[in-house]
A protein has these predicted regions:
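Rhodanese-like catalytic fold shared by cysteine-dependent sulfurtransferases
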Residues: 1-21, 27-59, 68-106
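Short, surface-exposed ligand- or partner-binding patches at beta-edge/loop junctions that are enriched
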Residues: 63-64
Length: 106
């Protein structure tokens, strides 16, 4: 099973109406600058104490600025028993460059 997803794959899944949890693990100030619609903000540093906010049976797509923190979050969630988690390769920056140029880059 792959634990990554590209921005184009994510866009296709969202366009199909797939039920996904978009987990933003950036800081609140970053989320205020740019975010994906309908995402849930849980900064990486608060993720361990925020697990109850997430459904272990849901498909979760973690994202951050470039994909590093969300990679850490993906690994952590898998260790905690979340079985359907993917890291968005390239993060919101790749989303802005390849999918939606209206999403601000920072």
């Amino acid at each position: 099973m792959s634990f990554t997803i590209t921005v184009k794959e994510l866009k296709a899944r969202l366009d199909k109406g797939d039920k996904l949890v978009l987990l933003d693990v950036r800081e609140p100030w970053e989320n205020a600058l740019a975010k994906l619609d309908n995402s849930v903000l849980i900064p990486l540093g608060t993720l361990p104490q925020s697990l109850a906010q997430l459904d272990k049976s849901a498909e979760i797509i973690a994202y951050c600025h470039h994909g590093m923190r969300s990679g850490d979050a993906t690994g952590f969630l898998l260790q905690q028993g979340f079985s359907n988690v993917k890291n968005l390769i390239g993060g919101i920056d790749a989303w802005s460059l390849q999918v939606d140029g209206k999403v601000p880059r920072y």
